[in-house]
Amino acid sequence: MTTRLPQLLLALLASAVSLAASADEVQVAVAANFTAPIQAIAKEFEKDTGHRLVAAYGATGQFYTQIKNGAPFQVFLSADDSTPAKLEQEGEVVPGSRFTYAIGTLALWSPKAGYVDAEGEVLKSGSFRHLSIANPKTAPYGLAATQAMDKLGLAATLGPKLVEGQNISQAYQFVSSGNAELGFVALSQIYKDGKVATGSAWIVPTELHDPIRQDAVILNKGKDNAAAKALVDYLKGAKAAALIKSYGYEL
């Protein structure tokens, strides 16, 4: 035993050194709606691959501008499919890397139980002062919210009540803090264990807005980064898929 122990320790050390040598860090721009899922995925990704994931969260439109201005992101998880496609057309993306990692769900939510009914009729009642949405110019969930209000014929009525967050996280914060009685949020922000975790919500029917297809790409700065390729592969795997679905997304 005394002669085998040093050999075992050396083998473990060699394995650790080998893993560290092959490990990389990947800088990821993450659409705000995907904050909780990517945090859960990152833990498993880092444990399973040895790579490190460093995430920044924000609005898709703002990330587009930052990427065009040379931001050091290597992977982009967008809240739509049009922005990654545009970056691809403009030569900012590793060819063939674009894919849909999730299909988002829009929800009308209030932290107050019973406030939002199952059919969204509360929107027609107008019995509230403020309705929160994400900026429709930069945030796909905000655009989906405006499309839904248009389809319902409520855009003119609800317009004066709108408060806009820079992204879907800020739209959620306006509601959770009480600055708005209700708001359009990503289902992933309020969903846990297969149900709405707190308050009351209406899942907005998909026919009221364009599909929220969320695409990912490897950006040119991640072309030679092993961690960037590993992350994209991981997002396509069964473990990530299960986590993504657990937050209310479709695949």
From Swiss-Prot:
Coiled coil: none annotated. Pfam families: SBP_bac_11. Residues 1-23 form the signal peptide. It is found in: Periplasm. SUPFAM superfamilies: Periplasmic binding protein-like II. Keywords: Metal-binding, Molybdenum, Periplasm, Signal, Transport, Tungsten. Molybdate binds at T60, I168. InterPro entries: AvModA-like_subst-bd (IPR044084), ModA (IPR005950), ModA/WtpA (IPR050682). GO terms for cellular component: periplasmic space. GO terms for biological process: molybdate ion transport. Disruption phenotype: Deletion of the gene reduces cellular molybdate concentrations and results in inhibition of anaerobic growth and nitrate reduction. GO terms for molecular function: metal ion binding; molybdate ion binding. It comes from the Bacteria. The complex is composed of two ATP-binding proteins (ModC), two transmembrane proteins (ModB) and a solute-binding protein (ModA). NCBIfam families: modA. Part of the ABC transporter complex ModABC involved in the transport of molybdenum into the cell. Binds tungstate and molybdate. Can also bind chromate, with lower affinity. Plays an essential role in recruitment of molybdate for nitrate reduction. Belongs to the bacterial solute-binding protein ModA family. This is Tungstate/molybdate/chromate-binding protein ModA. It comes from Pseudomonas aeruginosa (strain ATCC 15692 / DSM 22644 / CIP 104116 / JCM 14847 / LMG 12228 / 1C / PRS 101 / PAO1).
